[in-house]
Amino acid sequence: MREMQLASALTTRPARRILFLCIHNSARSQMAEGWARSLAGPEVQIWSAGTEPSRVHPAAIEVMREVGIDLTKQASKGLEDVPWQTMDTVVTVCGEGDEVCPVLAADVRRVHWPLPDPSRVEGEGQLDAFRKVRDDLRWRVASLLPRGD
């Protein structure tokens, strides 16, 4: 049901060059990049970046490893490190989506997923918060990709 709702909210044009964007490029955008690389075919190019990059959060690495996706080779990147001007789809994955998104060409599809920041959860509940965002991202990312991937 959620996949159908999300798919209907997007245009029918399949995403071929996707940028996942947030502030620190440490958790949500990194997990989205990991899912997209895992689920997409070779014709889809995928990046993630942040407006104030930091490091990939260890809990993001851990929970993605649980589903067989290795984030250890991914790094936190700034917009200057990715070809953001060439994207056909930019997905903001934080509550500050409009504030962090650069000025884009009119034909760039902008998608906003206001996901909670799991790194703000402290203590024993943090890994569960990361898992919840990880699982939510999986179906969202899958809905962006061309059918059959």
Where are the language model's segments positioned?
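Phosphate-binding/catalytic loops
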Residues: 2-9, 98-149
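Conserved active-site segments centered on acidic
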Residues: 2-80
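Short glycine-rich anion-binding loops that position phosphate/pyrophosphate groups of nucleotides
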Residues: 26, 95-99
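A short acidic, often aromatic-flanked loop/helix-cap motif at beta-alpha or helix-coil junctions
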Residues: 54-55, 81, 116-121
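Alpha-helix C-terminal capping/helix-to-coil transition sites in glycosyltransferase folds
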Residues: 84-86
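Short, Asp-centered acidic motifs that coordinate Mg2+ and/or phosphate
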Residues: 89
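Redox-cofactor binding/interface segments in oxidoreductases and associated redox assembly factors
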Residues: 92-93, 112
